[in-house]
Amino acid sequence: MKEKLASVWKKDGTRSVAASLLSILIGLAVGSLVILIVGCTSSTLSSKSAWEGIQLIFLGLFTTGRDAAGALTFGFNSASFGNMLFRATPLILTGLSVAVAFKTGLFNIGAAGQYLAGTCATLFIALSIPSSVVPAWLIWLIAFLGGMLAGALWGAIPGLLKALLNINEVIACIMTNWIAANLVTWLFDISNLKNITDGTKSGYIYKTTFNGVATSKMGLDRLFPGSQVNGGILIAIVLAVVVFVLLTRTTFGYELKACGANRYAARYAGIHDKRCIVLSMSIAGALAGAAGSLYYLSGNTEFFWSTYQALPTAGFNGIAVALLAVNHPIGVIFAGLFMSTLDISGLQLTNLTAYNEYITDVIIAVIVYLAAFSLLIKLWLNGKKRQAKPQPAAAAPLPGAAEQAQPDPTASNNEKEAQG
């Protein structure tokens, strides 16, 4: 049994998962410590509030409210579970976007801009084609594919700059992020898609339901009544599986990873490295565009376009998801669900206590920093393994070798030295 456990522990994947779990535990511990310190030092909070805050951080997804006595109650909260799945959808897709680029040795910090490009294209298509002429399901499909295409084209820009001009993709992505933000603002400003029917929604775009277009619930609303969940989470999971197969079961995936390991060695082996860079960033952009597309095709959320001075957090949270998942497509699913769970816990923390929901941002920040150091943890584990590895025994001398090596006692000194 011990030998089996030892063999499992020696696997690189096991140590990667262990490093991520350790990052999560330390992040939760730090968040709990912050809650405790604030609760014990604040004049408006108490130690009881601190204990309730810690409970909500760990069990916020299962919180059902407070009873008549004011105590927290826990159980299956269908609305919280469904909303967690809804919020996890863009996180999974932006996490995949970052992970695919990482596999090719690229840092896609431009997921936010690609997310905006996909959102813009999706909303224009979904709200411009009249559902009285074209079936709503077909409009949805065209809008979703259009969002992916817009994200792919926007992601291809830093890919082309990297492949053809060797411009650092981080710099190119940062620039394209803000170009996308201002371009989207201008396009919506001159459009007729602004919500003018509701005076309280100035600066917002109509929901896609205004044109009768929305993502199908696929029966999930019956499992999680009272929530915003829809079939987008299933689409995100399917795309994650497709990316996993692409990277691990195809020649193209091998070429992408070969370029990520060593671009010049891959070129020497006959792989078209420039094409891999452009296609990798295009795929990453398509996934980020799909994230924005599914989020707003849900019909649950209005897009705020006016004076866009902040990039969507989903693009940057995708970096945290990819780091936590160690860039594994299947791991991205679980990492996205975990990050979404923290988001729900933060909302419960705000609704049921006097704490601020941004405490969960502290937890996420700690987890991201530790996840970035997970490689050091793995290297440390590898070092310990090498130290514990027994040295191979010296080879036994061949029969008769000892006799051949012994000098002849009757020989002269010069002959003995020659024999030695």
Which stretches of residues belong to each language-model region?
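Cytosolic-side transmembrane-helix boundaries in multi-pass membrane proteins
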Residues: 1-27, 32, 36-37, 51, ...
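Membrane-interfacial amphipathic/re-entrant helices at transmembrane-helix boundaries
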Residues: 2-93, 138
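Hydrophobic core segments of alpha-helical transmembrane domains in multi-pass membrane transport
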Residues: 19-36, 91-98, 119, 123-125, ...
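Single transmembrane alpha-helix segments in multi-pass membrane proteins
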Residues: 35-40, 59-129, 144-148, 152-167, ...
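Short, non-helical or kinked segments that cap or interrupt transmembrane helices
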Residues: 41-45, 49, 102-121, 163-172, ...
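Transmembrane helix-bundle core of multi-pass membrane transporters
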Residues: 177-249, 417
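Helix-loop-helix "hairpin" substructures at the membrane interface of multi-pass membrane proteins
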Residues: 224-302, 330
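Transmembrane alpha-helical segments in multi-pass inner-membrane proteins
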Residues: 282-365
